[in-house]
């Protein structure tokens, strides 16, 4: 079945599985980058505790780079899918070309931060000179060679928008394999390669990302034939850029808020380096679970957006129903794994003094996964139906308005010696349940105003 016909005619439940599985694997492998780095770094011969703390502190900036790349890609994805659904191939070519122009601008900003801003950022979260040195070295490499992750994110969304998510997953798998192979070689020093410690982890990560980006560039040029490829379409078009970010900016802010949340949580937990490290480790496991929901969301959005472009009320409703159902199934599996095996995750990271904090955090925070996954699915639905503001509000509730004040208040009692650090972890499930209730109300309103009103 041709790709455009598949998006139009294939039953939605089957289409979502076919598109969703590669995307889920792709997002899971993206989370593996950070988990693999932490696992290998945690087993370094010396300085592993400081190195794990350094990776915790650099994580918000890594997330921010991904946020801007993926958010721009999300806007491109939804707009391109809708444009193709309307049969406008010329505009589709401009959408794809402008997304690549935006990618170049994003890389220049990351490059400048990598050269001039990294050390000041790390120093704001710790006074330990070893952690500052390790964090600065790692993050500078990731920023200066960030073009891999930025352009991978864009090409991934361009392929997903045309229903070719399998190829984006192939690129992700190849990059992940390269990263995993290089990690022990560059971190520990094997054969002619010298021992580089955290620098080696950074080099392994960015090389894997560059390989993925190059492979997806080839797939994009050879397979996305629904529209023309030409550098003339990279000429900035204000109207198209505005449309991309009308959809994608809330996604960027949503992802950026995750970075802000992690950064502020690091500051809140600054009183206990072990708790700070534990938070960084469990957050990577949490992201691994939630990235399953993000992957499915990336199938939900183009399916519903394409259906919205062709005014198919039934396919939109099917997309919403199956998207939420499949998300809940994935999150139940995630809760089961994290509740049953927290000790095994701690052993993987060689968590040391942070072990008990890590296990306690996992058992409490995993309660929130089902509600968090539903919130992610809601946001994918909103983005497909021009509900960017609703998506932004859910992100603000989850990443800023509720969780940070709660965690700050709870930390006041913890620092006063009235109760253990575990109180802070309860801010996560409270936040997700509250946001989920608000998200349901938004979904009802969007369904009434956008879907039921279709002719």
Which stretches of residues belong to each language-model region?
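Short alpha-helical transmembrane segments in multi-pass integral membrane proteins
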Residues: 1-20, 80-147, 193-248, 304-368, ...
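N-terminal transmembrane alpha-helices
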Residues: 7-39, 43-47, 60-75, 79, ...
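Transmembrane helical elements of multi-pass membrane transporters/channels
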Residues: 18-37, 141, 175, 208-212, ...
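Transmembrane alpha-helix boundary and packing residues in multipass membrane permease domains
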Residues: 23, 27, 39, 78, ...
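Helix-terminus/linker motif at the lipid-water interface of multi-pass membrane proteins
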Residues: 28, 32-53, 122-129, 185-196, ...
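Small-residue hotspots at the loop-to-helix junctions and early N-terminal turns
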Residues: 49-60, 135, 139, 273-288, ...
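Small-residue-rich hydrophobic transmembrane alpha-helices
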Residues: 52-112, 149-168, 278-342, 372-386, ...
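Short runs within selected transmembrane alpha-helices of multi-pass transporters and secretion channels
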Residues: 73, 142-160, 168-176, 201-216, ...
